Amino acid sequence: MKYAAFKLAGVALSLSLAWSSAQADTLRIAADPVPHAEILNYVKKLDPKLDITVVELTSGANANELLANGDVDANYFQHVPYLKDQEKALGKTFAVAATVHIEPLGIYSRKYKDFKDVPEKATVAVPNNATNLSRALFLLQSQGLIKLSAQFTDPASTLATPKDIAENPKQLKILEVESPQIPRSLDDVDLAVINGNYALEAGLSPAKDALGLESADHNPYANILVTNPNLANDPRIKALAKDLTSPQVAEFIRKTYNGSVIPVSPQS
């Protein structure tokens, strides 16, 4: 009986170790539901040998904190300027494993069809985090709604705030709002500057519904796969990066999102 019990215990331990080993081989990737998780789920079908678990982010979750704490192995939801801001805020250094796609920032309205119809003192909802706030102001400038101070010429290297608006001919009122909440504010504001992923989640088509849209040319806000430096050369991360930048994934992005999400140049 003692031998049988010992043998059963040994089997249980072996199964436990095997399960732990299998878990260790699984990559946990934190991602926004749209389009990031959808793209990752396509990768799972494209490359069944790559074992990944997609952890969809809920409102308020910080995927960089999850990564820093080891709760996930990588994340896929952000662009480089936001990542740099997060590295400063968290006192951490991360590694970019792949550059995948661009989600052009857009200006939306349920009240107006053309910027010329926007009245004076109209309200404009913009993201409240530093990088996307600056990005929104540069977009408003590109549409002729405001003008920033002369030193703000490069959105990739300078962060503008509402205090840096030099000209505001319509006296627009800039309202800083949590990015995921902005689509819900569309009925309450005159204009809303919305990130591509949140626009898609809200059922908007950036390519069709936006009054003004960022150009994809030389856009510094490409979305990236990010990991910890100690995993940067992990074969699983490298395999995922290769899949995400493959021609097959680029074609999936083009067909699925019809210009609302734009793949970067894929690897051959």
Label every PLM stretch briefly.
Residues 85-97, 110-112, 186-188, 193, ...:
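Ligand-binding "clamshell"
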Residues 97-147, 250:
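A conserved helix-loop-strand patch within extracytoplasmic ligand-binding domains
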Residues 26, 30-53, 62:
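Short, polar/charged alpha-helical segment
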Residues 55-65, 152-184:
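Short helix-initiation/N-cap motifs at beta->coil->alpha
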Residues 98-109, 134-141, 200-242, 244-268:
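Periplasmic-binding protein-like
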Residues 34, 58-60, 75-84, 101, ...:
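Beta->alpha turn/N-cap motifs
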